[in-house]
Amino acid sequence: MIDFEHVSKTYETHNDENVALEDINIHIDEGEFVFILGHSGAGKSTFLKLIQMEEKPTEGRVLVNGQDLTKLKRRKVPYLRRQMGVVFQDFRLIPTMTVYENVAFAMRVTNISTKKIKARVPFALSLVGLEDKMDRLPDELSGGEQQRVAVARALAHGPKIIIADEPTGNIDPEMSMDIMQLFEAINKVNITVVVVTHEHELVHKLAAKYNNLSLIHI
């Protein structure tokens, strides 16, 4: 599903080089629930950018669903990204749009038909327990509820992979566990879930609770 083969990424600066990743090898199987754990500056953001082809590795290969991203043509990048749903730490909801409109908008910009949008948005919101709040604006929701909208938005187009970038960074510990339980439920329907975080304590709590988690340090 996701493979990093001897991947290094170096950023050139004016007078120096910044090594973000060095000789990283990672294998994530289809249907896995994986935590990528690392401190600030460990290269977690670079890992995400490489998967989404926002960056290319300096050395090595990145493969997603068998596609070698180092050889993927630029015109095929949108198709790659449609296989993924991304959940951000800061939610990135549009404040003037309702819950329904936020999820629908993300589908509309990828040219999904109106018919599919009308079917998929309520379904995605029901999966995260927000079907009764479709007409609310983001500022009428709690932080945990806003993150659930972000998860629904990531799910709505039917991705094979969910990638969550520090998804508990802006919510309290109790809500963090709720969000993780939601990811576990998503994973049970054979969606690969990759959570990138620096929160060691949360990860170890979850590892004690669920026996299907995989942990990768970078």
Predicted regions and their residues:
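Conserved small/polar residues in nucleotide/adenosyl-binding loops
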Residues: 216-218
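A short, proline-enriched helix->beta-strand linker immediately N-terminal to the Walker B motif
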Residues: 156-160
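Conserved ABC ATPase signature
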Residues: 137-141, 145-147
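Helix-to-loop junction immediately C-terminal to a conserved catalytic motif
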Residues: 52
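Short coil-to-helix segment of the ABC ATPase nucleotide-binding domain corresponding to the Q-loop/switch region
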Residues: 97-105
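Catalytic Walker B motif of ABC-type/P-loop ATPase nucleotide-binding domains
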Residues: 162-165
